[in-house]
């Protein structure tokens, strides 16, 4: 699908790569690379680091206009469509609206990275409005996500989608290691994973006490961040109040059809995109004895979502460059990716497997991590699926 003809650097049929139950995937290099972050930055054209408020905001306006167009069509024309065509119409609306709102979510994510404009205050205002409208506590997630970028690939300090060792996985996991179990696990993860992460830190790094993105005094945040966590909570309260008023005026069924189901699709895409960016049989994780920031930042995979690459503002197919240079705006990210690929060589990871096939494969093969038996270092961990 899509991908502009890019070749995958991870797929191979070389039988010498039979490790960890992934004979069809070539492992990424895990030793220190022969290049530096400075080498990569010098390869990127300087204009790729320029952030234009006008250009960035044009994408916000475009997404909002499309979202309003879909809303107008649904509310003005769908009541006159008889069943069963009305069911088809609503399914199309939910899918289209969910995809557009996912793209809008991505722009809010860029605001949190200061990749929207040269003005931090403008970035935070736009990000707060956009993410609050999608029931995301903007500042709370901005700070936890920043720590994810600072510690990516570390088994001890990464913030989210931290794989467990075989000895620490849940006792019931092996009973879900079958097709029905994987369907159940994927459904629960896609539908509930994002709100459970925000509210209960599910799939997040362990803390010594209860961690929650809505708690200004929780262990995720520092004292200087608390005021902004309150502001993020106020944003969620404001959106919840608007939804309450809409429910009183139009009914819960109307709110769910117009807003609730598209938001659920946003949450599903968000979990799937994030999961596939950081989960792959061919990429390592590092213990404290091996981890360093540059190698950790390369523990990510660019994926192909076809036409949705543009709808999602290239968040999925330029994610390697994003973890190396998070302030590059999305409209320069593809150019930056093309610039660093020749230098990175096999350290750059791209997998063109259709995302629905990749999701099933990763759910099957990436269950826990362990170091290779007899390896010279025990600080490099690889995904396994054999209990």
UniProtKB/Swiss-Prot annotation:
Pfam family, one: DUF3474
Tissue spec: Expressed in seeds. Barely detected in leaves.
Chain ranges for the short sequence motif Histidine box-3 as given in the UniProt record: 319-323
Record localization: Microsome membrane
InterPro entries referenced in this protein's UniProt entry, alphabetically: FA_desaturase_dom, FAS_N, Fatty_acid_desaturase
Catalyzed reaction equations: a 1-acyl-2-(9Z)-octadecenoyl-sn-glycero-3-phosphocholine + 2 Fe(II)-[cytochrome b5] + O2 + 2 H(+) = a 1-acyl-2-[(R)-12-hydroxyoleoyl]-sn-glycero-3-phosphocholine + 2 Fe(III)-[cytochrome b5] + H2O
pH dependence: Optimum pH is 6.3.
Signal sequence segment: none
Known EC number: 1.14.18.4
Motif Histidine box-2 location, chain numbering: 145-149
GO BP term (any one): fatty acid biosynthetic process
Pathway of action: Lipid metabolism; monounsaturated fatty acid biosynthesis
Effect caused by changing residue 319 to Q: In OLE-1; enhanced accumulation of oleic acid but low ricinoleic acid levels in seeds, high-oleic castor mutant 1
Source domain of life: Eukaryota
Name of the top EC class for this enzyme: oxidoreductase
Region of interest (Disordered), ranges: 1-34
Positions occupied by motif Histidine box-1: 109-113
Effect of mutating residue 49 to S: Strongly reduced ricinoleic acid accumulation
Function: Oleoyl-12-hydroxylase involved in the biosynthesis of ricinoleate (12-hydroxy-cis-9-octadecenoate), the major fatty acid constituent of the oil seeds from castor bean plants. Catalyzes the hydroxylation at the 12-position of 1-acyl-2-oleoyl-sn-glycero-3-phosphocholine (2-oleoyl-PC), which seems to be the actual physiological subtrate. It uses cytochrome b5 as an electron donor. May also be involved in the production of lesquerolic acid (14-hydroxyeicos-cis-ll-enoic acid) in vitro.
Protein name: Oleoyl-12-hydroxylase FAH12
Provenance organism: Ricinus communis
Lineage of origin: Eukaryota, Viridiplantae, Streptophyta, Embryophyta, Tracheophyta
Gene this chain is encoded by: FAH12
């Amino acid at each position: 699908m899509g991908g502009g003809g890019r070749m995958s650097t991870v797929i191979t049929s070389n039988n010498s790569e039979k490790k960890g139950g992934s004979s069809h995937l070539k492992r990424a290099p895990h030793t220190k690379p022969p290049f530096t972050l400075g080498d990569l930055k010098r390869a990127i054209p300087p204009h790729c680091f320029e952030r234009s408020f006008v250009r960035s905001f044009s994408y916000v306006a475009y997404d909002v206009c499309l979202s309003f167009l879909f809303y107008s069509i649904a509310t003005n024309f769908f009541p006159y469509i008889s069943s069963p065509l009305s069911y088809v119409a609503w399914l199309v609306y939910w899918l289209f609206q969910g995809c557009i709102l996912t793209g809008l979510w991505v722009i809010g994510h860029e605001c949190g990275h200061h990749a929207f404009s040269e003005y931090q205050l403008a970035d935070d205002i736009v990000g707060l409005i956009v993410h609050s409208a999608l029931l995301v506590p903007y500042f709370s997630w901005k700070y936890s996500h920043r720590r994810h970028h600072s510690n990516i690939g570390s088994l001890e300090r990464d913030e989210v989608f931290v794989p467990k060792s075989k000895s620490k996985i849940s006792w019931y996991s092996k009973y879900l290691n079958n097709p029905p179990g994987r369907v159940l696990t994927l459904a629960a993860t896609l539908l509930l994973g994002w709100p459970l992460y925000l509210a209960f830190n599910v799939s997040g790094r362990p803390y010594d006490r209860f961690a929650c993105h809505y708690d200004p005094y929780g262990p995720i945040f520092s004292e200087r961040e608390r005021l902004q966590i309150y502001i993020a909570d106020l944003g969620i309260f404001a959106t919840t109040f608007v939804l309450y008023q809409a429910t009183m005026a139009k009914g819960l069924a109307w709110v769910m059809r117009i807003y609730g189901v598209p938001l659920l699709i946003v949450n599903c895409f968000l979990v799937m995109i994030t999961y596939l960016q950081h989960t792959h049989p061919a990429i390592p994780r590092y213990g404290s004895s091996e981890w360093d920031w540059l190698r950790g930042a390369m523990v990510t995979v660019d994926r192909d979502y076809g036409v949705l690459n543009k709808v999602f503002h290239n968040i999925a197919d330029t994610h390697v460059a994003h973890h190396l240079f998070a302030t590059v705006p999305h409209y320069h990210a593809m150019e930056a990716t093309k610039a660093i690929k020749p230098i990175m060589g096999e350290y750059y990871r791209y997998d063109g497997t259709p995302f629905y096939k990749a999701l099933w494969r990763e759910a099957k093969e990436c269950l826990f991590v362990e170091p290779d038996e007899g390896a010279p270092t025990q600080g490099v961990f690889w995904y396994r699926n054999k209990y």
